[in-house]
Amino acid sequence: MTGHIDPLCYLEPSQASGRSFVARKHQGALVMLNLLRFRNTADYSAHLELAPAAPISGASAFQRYIEHTLPYLHASGGDMSFLGAGGEFLIGPPGERWDLVMLVRQHSVESFLAFATHQDYLAGMGHRLAALEDSRLLPLSELPLPSVPRCDIDA
């Protein structure tokens, strides 16, 4: 499940990226684009309290993270709106791949921050960290779709 490995891996936001995110003063709904690359075998060495009795895949560890997370996400007003299997890019660096793509919608930056700092949610974060080799998280502001007439194309 691994692909191109960058010399730097990103599993958590930095202080600088967190400050920049808050400084954007985003208004309204927010969609978080998650690109996720799994470890072949989950690494629970930093979170032994969450480790299963036998080794599991990174994908299985991430499934445990999702199952732990969804109740807190829903309680914060958020929702997972898309989950899809990834692969290599059609347009992008050759050999770069992401195993899973996830879109998470939140009503506001405030609701996202309340969710992301909730102590019970954070108690399961070790599943995510054990699962991932690398990740990207891109906050997106929704734009209105253009209203353009559709064309009929004969196949």
Language model features with spans:
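A conserved hydrophobic position in a structured secondary element of the catalytic/binding core
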Residues: 104-107, 116
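Short, hydrophobic/aromatic alpha-helical segments in well-folded domains
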Residues: 102, 111, 124-127
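Short S/T/G/P-rich N-terminal loop/turn motif that feeds into the first structured element of a domain
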Residues: 1-100, 107, 111, 141-155
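Low-complexity RS/RG/RGG-rich segments used by eukaryotic RNA-binding proteins and nuclear co-regulators
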Residues: 130, 139-142
